[in-house]
From Swiss-Prot:
Any one Gene Ontology molecular-function term assigned to this protein's record: structural constituent of ribosome
InterPro entries in UniProt: Ribosomal_uS4, Ribosomal_uS4_bac-type, Ribosomal_uS4_CS, Ribosomal_uS4_N, S4_RNA-bd, S4_RNA-bd_sf
Subunit structure: Part of the 30S ribosomal subunit. Contacts protein S5. The interaction surface between S4 and S5 is involved in control of translational fidelity.
Species of the source: Lactobacillus gasseri (strain ATCC 33323 / DSM 20243 / BCRC 14619 / CIP 102991 / JCM 1131 / KCTC 3163 / NCIMB 11718 / NCTC 13722 / AM63)
Single GO BP term: translation
Keyword annotations from UniProtKB, A to Z: Ribonucleoprotein, Ribosomal protein, RNA-binding, rRNA-binding
Entry protein name: Small ribosomal subunit protein uS4
């Protein structure tokens, strides 16, 4: 299944949240496209709620269904912890997401492009695979010539805070995954239990 390349604002309005994290998509109209106002939404079934939650998280991280499902299956093989929380933690450890969490990119999509175009180093070595799983203690940095990219400067200037599971050295422009993320440090808009229920019926 190919990755969706249409306008993200439509998906954001449909879900009622900002998928990019900027908030711009729903700042003017916080109701679904096609609705004639915020109070014109139909009731959603249990099936619909589960599907919506799955799509919400998948679209947040920009994965296709196969990538998303495979990661969910892998999370189920982790012995400790809850399946849904482990799944979200694996998503958080993707290289493109860590680049986003460090503030080197304004959105996950922008972070994915930085990785794809070879701007990102992991422990000093170039890694151009967005799905690369960052390990605790690994250092994330930019190639020297990439530190002057305007989009990187703009992203860093806009940083208000970073999640506590990462650290960042502003002078060196390097960051580290200092520990695994805890549930309350991950996406608060997501009910991962609904996603587990969805896949338990499908797999």
């Amino acid at each position: 299944m190919s990755r969706y390349t249409g306008p993200s604002w439509k998906r954001s309005r449909r879900l009622g949240i900002s998928l990019s994290g900027t908030g711009k998509e729903i700042s003017r109209r916080n109701y679904a496209p096609g609705d004639h106002g915020p109070n014109n939404r139909a009731k959603v079934s249990e099936y619909g709620q589960q599907l919506k939650e799955k799509q919400k998280l998948r679209w947040m991280f920009g994965l296709n269904e196969r990538q998303f499902q495979n990661l969910f299956i892998r999370a189920g093989k982790i012995r400790e912890g809850k399946h849904g929380v482990n799944f979200m933690a694996l998503l958080e450890r993707r290289l493109d997401n860590i680049v986003y969490r460090l503030g080197l990119a304004s959105t996950r999509e922008q972070a994915r492009q930085l990785v794809n175009h070879g701007h990102i180093l992991v422990d000093g070595k170039r890694v151009d695979i967005p799905s690369y799983e960052v390990k605790v203690g690994q250092e994330i940095s930019l190639r020297d010539k990439s530190k002057n990219l305007q989009q990187v400067k703009d992203a860093l200037d806009a940083v208000v805070s970073r999640p506590p599971f990462v650290s960042f050295d502003d002078s060196k422009m390097t960051g580290t995954l200092v520990r695994l993320p805890e549930r309350d440090e991950m996406e608060p808009e997501v009910d991962e239990a609904l996603i587990v229920e969805w896949y338990n019926k499908k797999l």
